[in-house]
UniProtKB/Swiss-Prot annotation:
One of its GO terms (biological process) is error-free translesion synthesis. InterPro entries: ApaG_domain (IPR007474), ApaG_sf (IPR036767), Uncharacterised_ApaG (IPR023065). This is Protein ApaG. It comes from Sinorhizobium fredii (strain NBRC 101917 / NGR234). The lineage of its organism: Bacteria, Pseudomonadati, Pseudomonadota, Alphaproteobacteria, Hyphomicrobiales. SUPFAM superfamilies: ApaG-like. Pfam families: DUF525. Residues 3-127 form the ApaG domain.
Length: 130
């Protein structure tokens, strides 16, 4: 599990390999990830946009951005938690993702909340140190 805390907004990520959707013989590797966003602050915030920086093991970078998450722009009141799941396909057996959410506070202030970097590793992947 991976965690980041920005201005009392906690983001927790739990990635998992989706073997049934992956096809290594066709260079298709798919991961799901579960995200929990917890508002530990004293003000309400709305998740407005997302930004992802995805890098595969060959260094190929894909950047993804857009409004909300899974079609929603959730409002998190103080003490609220919001959970969602999504996925990421890669052409390589491993990679890494990180990013941020743009949040809008109830007073109109906007700020970014970090999504922690997390690894996408296929089961049985052997790593060697040089």
């Amino acid at each position: 599990m991976y965690r980041a805390l920005t201005r009392d907004i906690e983001v927790t990520v739990e990635p998992y390999y989706l073997e049934e959707q992956s096809d290594p013989d066709d260079s298709r590797y798919v991961w799901g990830y579960r995200i929990v966003i917890s508002n530990h602050s004293e003000i309400a915030v709305r998740l407005m946009t997302r930004y992802w920086h995805i890098t595969d093991e060959n260094g190929q970078v894909d950047e993804v951005s857009g409004p909300g998450v899974i079609g929603e722009q959730p409002l998190l009141n103080p003490g609220d938690t919001y959970e969602y799941s999504s996925g990421c396909p890669l052409d390589t057996p491993s990679g890494v993702m990180f990013g941020h959410y743009s949040m809008e506070a109830e007073d109109g202030e906007t700020f970014n909340v970090a999504i922690p970097a997390f690894s996408l590793d296929s089961p049985g992947l052997v790593r060697t140190l040089n």
